Amino acid sequence: PVLENIVYFYAKSHDYSISVGRIGKLECDFILRDHKMNYAYVQVAYTIALSKKTEDREYKSLESIRDNYPKYVMTTDYLLQNRNGIKHVNLMDFIISNSTF
């Protein structure tokens, strides 16, 4: 929950509206919406590098979303692996560079 809280407060500090999403039995940690009605979907995990099962779980819910808004898996990993158009980003690098979703 600590990393999720960091992402939540970071998104709030950039004026995103935040909700949690459900896609069938799957859950998306955050659905973010900016003031221009642009969306982004975010999954947060400490690491996906140690377990293929964890990696698949984090990507699966995002892969089931069929629109073209950006999708992110945010972790503390430094070996990043994008998959099916979903961006795998290092959480701390994202925040330090003051990136937006």
Which residues are covered by each model-predicted region?
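A cross-kingdom feature that marks ATP-driven nucleic-acid transaction machinery
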Residues: 1-101
